[in-house]
Amino acid sequence: MELRVGNRYRLGRKIGSGSFGDIYLGTDITTGEEVAIKLECVKTKHPQLHIESKIYKMMQGGVGIPTIKWCGAEGDYNVMVMELLGPSLEDLFNFCSRKFSLKTVLLLADQMISRIEYIHSKNFIHRDVKPDNFLMGLGKKGNLVYIIDFGLAKKYRDARTHQHIPYRENKNLTGTARYASINTHLGIEQSRRDDLESLGYVLMYFNLGSLPWQGLKAATKRQKYERISEKKMSTPIEVLCKGYPSEFATYLNFCRSLRFDDKPDYSYLRQLFRNLFHRQGFSYDYVFDWNMLKFGGAREDPERDRRDREERIRQGRIPLPRVMLPTSSGRPRGTQEVAPAPPLTPDSHTGMERERKVSMRLHRGAPVNVSSSDLTGRQDCSRISTSQAHSRVPSGLQSAVPR
């Protein structure tokens, strides 16, 4: 039996989950296009999918915003069908052994600042800026950074008058503690400055491999947040950014200097990193670290990789991996800090053998429904049969969808 949503999208296997929704691979039966289908039980205590889909719709048309194809209800489930995307930056960070080159960090920073600026221009703040919420596109959009997960987004000003929300204190921490701004830790209402400060921590995370306040232990969630806050506030920006170009410290100092309702100078921040990019002699060829690892670990010879990549493009081969779907976390308010991702230690292969196998998979174009754990070499998933896919679909949806 064939399961459909919106009488157009065939439901496939489950490929991700969040705190208030599961994500399935789907297929548009009219065009054959693969899509991501997010389901949320209508009986959930705090429904979020309808709100999130409305925000996505307000963002439609922006560069790096996933296309929403259909929203509605099927049986016991709220449904959102959206464009299928590639791996998250967190997945790619793990694939690259938890270290990005300066060139890759700067290429990402330029696009990430623009995504945040666009969201702000639409009168919203994201409030959960982290590597998991930035995904790469697929195919021709493989070099494009997308921003996802508006489950915690909030309107910060009136759309017509641009009246800013009032300054408030004693707010609970919203977002992910690892990347939260200092003002967020202090209980101050979030605004545009906080999204950008969080991005600064993400960039240093990419540079360093981890942040000084990761891995702290505490008896309770509140105590852990306090320990993270104390470590963050006691670590001077210059110490955090030591050994890296001064632009990273300049960026964070600028963000922390903004007042609550200030409009950030996004162009200034982008130009900071663009000037550094040019001084380093880098080329805007959009060859990221994972592209070089993908084709046999040619990290030492970027010029050869560029020539190989151009040859693949001339031959009509897709230059980027199709490795997974968007893993929108859908994390509810008060998201907990998560532990650092484990090191890449395969169960039965050496690191070199694992990298070779992953590179070979990417070289031949891994299917889009491969899980993120497969990307890091932990397991080898293949497409499941139709009967298996159906067995994973909630029964409330099975009874509601036309056979």
Curated annotation (Swiss-Prot):
Residues 9-277 form the Protein kinase domain. It comes from the Eukaryota. ATP binds at residues 15-23, 38. GO terms for cellular component: cytoplasm; nucleus; spindle microtubule. The active site is at residue 128. It catalyses: L-seryl-[protein] + ATP = O-phospho-L-seryl-[protein] + ADP + H(+); L-threonyl-[protein] + ATP = O-phospho-L-threonyl-[protein] + ADP + H(+). Pfam families: Pkinase (PF00069). Exhibits substrate-dependent heparin activation. It is found in: Cytoplasm; Nucleus. Autophosphorylated on serine and threonine residues. It is an enzyme of class 2 (transferase). Casein kinases are operationally defined by their preferential utilization of acidic proteins such as caseins as substrates. Central component of the circadian clock. May act as a negative regulator of circadian rhythmicity by phosphorylating per1 and per2, which may lead to their degradation. Participates in wnt signaling. Monomer. Interacts with per1 and per2. Component of the circadian core oscillator. PANTHER family: CASEIN KINASE-RELATED. Belongs to the protein kinase superfamily. This is Casein kinase I isoform delta-A. It comes from Danio rerio (Zebrafish).
